[in-house]
């Protein structure tokens, strides 16, 4: 994997294996008010993240194997059915979330991206409502398809499923 650091390490570009993009399945895609987009995809090797302006080279591309990705599944309560997925790049975490408002008539989808360094929030992007391409439970489903299962006793994912 090739990596380039720019600035203070907040922006790191890494090259994905060529074969990874060919069989990718989109988990989340949306546009933000600033004209940029985020795409989150999965393949047999892990999760890929792209952020930047459409039609241009992405500002940030990450690819992480499943054992380096954190997925928080919906706990089963609340107005929204939601989940989030976090990818780490050094000390910076890119947390993407998707939700469905189950109490509204239209069952509106929403999604977004939160960039954090430790406990500090560096940036927050809300997806434009009409741009959200997200299927409820797709983060958890992708993790399960990769061979992980959620344990309700200790609220963790494990590789050895019974």
Residue ranges of model-derived segments:
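Bacterial N-terminal signal peptides that target proteins for export
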Residues: 1-9
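C-terminal segment of classical bacterial N-terminal signal peptides
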Residues: 14-21
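Cysteine-centric segments in proteins
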Residues: 22-162
């Amino acid at each position: 994997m090739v990596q380039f650091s720019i600035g203070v390490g907040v922006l790191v570009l890494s090259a994905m294996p060529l074969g990874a993009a060919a069989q990718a399945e989109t988990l989340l895609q949306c546009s933000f008010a600033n004209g940029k987009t985020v795409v989150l995809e999965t393949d047999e090797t892990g999760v890929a993240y792209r952020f930047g302006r459409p039609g241009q080279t992405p500002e940030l591309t990450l690819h992480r194997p499943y054992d380096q990705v954190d997925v928080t599944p919906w706990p089963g309560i609340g107005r929204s059915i939601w989940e989030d997925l976090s990818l780490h790049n050094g000390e910076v975490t890119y947390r993407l979330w998707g939700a469905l408002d189950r109490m509204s008539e239209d069952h509106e989808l929403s999604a977004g991206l939160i960039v954090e360094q430790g406990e500090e929030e560096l940036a927050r992007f809300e997806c434009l409502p009409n741009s959200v391409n997200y299927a409820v439970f797709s983060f958890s489903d992708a993790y399960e398809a990769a061979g992980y299962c959620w344990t309700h006793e200790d609220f963790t994912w494990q590789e050895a499923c019974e």
